[in-house]
């Protein structure tokens, strides 16, 4: 069963283990359903982390791939150029 982990790579490895287990076909139905639910939950968590990372990169890089300058007084928002 999936456990709460903060590390993206660990969660991705756990999801891969679940997929491998389910693909083997040697899992009782009830266990397969539990594993599937855990996999869906992990998949959603990973997707959220990827979306968050993508948004962070978008804030730091303009459409041409150049780094944006951050306003030191408001480090979370890039300066307008």
From Swiss-Prot:
Region ranges (Disordered)? 59-81
Q: What is its EC number?
A: 3.1.11.6
UniProt-listed InterPro entries: Exonuc_VII_S (IPR003761), Exonuc_VII_ssu_sf (IPR037004)
- Name the reaction it catalyses: Exonucleolytic cleavage in either 5'- to 3'- or 3'- to 5'-direction to yield nucleoside 5'-phosphates
Tell me if Cytoplasm is a UniProt keyword of this record.
Answer: yes
The reply on keyword Transmembrane is no
Biological processes, Gene Ontology terms: DNA catabolic process
Which GO MF terms are attached to this record? exodeoxyribonuclease VII activity
So which domain of life are we looking at? Bacteria
Q: Name one GO cellular component term.
A: exodeoxyribonuclease VII complex
Q: Which EC class is the enzyme in?
A: hydrolase
This protein's UniProt keywords: Cytoplasm, Exonuclease, Hydrolase, Nuclease
Chain intervals with Polar residues compositional bias: 71-81
| Location in the cell | Cytoplasm
- Ranges of Basic and acidic residues composition bias in the record: 60-70
Q: Which family does it belong to?
A: Belongs to the XseB family.
Give the HAMAP family listed for this entry. Exonuc_7_S
Q: Subunit structure of this entry?
A: Heterooligomer composed of large and small subunits.
As for what it does, the entry says: Bidirectionally degrades single-stranded DNA into large acid-insoluble oligonucleotides, which are then degraded further into small acid-soluble oligonucleotides.
By what name is this protein known? Exodeoxyribonuclease 7 small subunit
Q: Which organism is it from?
A: Lactobacillus gasseri (strain ATCC 33323 / DSM 20243 / BCRC 14619 / CIP 102991 / JCM 1131 / KCTC 3163 / NCIMB 11718 / NCTC 13722 / AM63)
Gene encoding it?
xseB
């Amino acid at each position: 069963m999936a456990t709460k982990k903060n590390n993206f790579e660990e969660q991705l490895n756990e999801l891969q283990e679940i997929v491998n287990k389910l693909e083997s076909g040697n899992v009782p139905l009830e266990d397969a359903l539990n594993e599937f639910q855990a996999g869906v939950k992990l998949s959603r968590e990973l997707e959220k982390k990827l979306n968050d990372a993508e948004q962070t990169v978008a804030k730091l890089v303009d459409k041409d791939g150049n780094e944006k300058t951050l306003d030191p007084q408001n480090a979370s928002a890039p300066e307008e150029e």
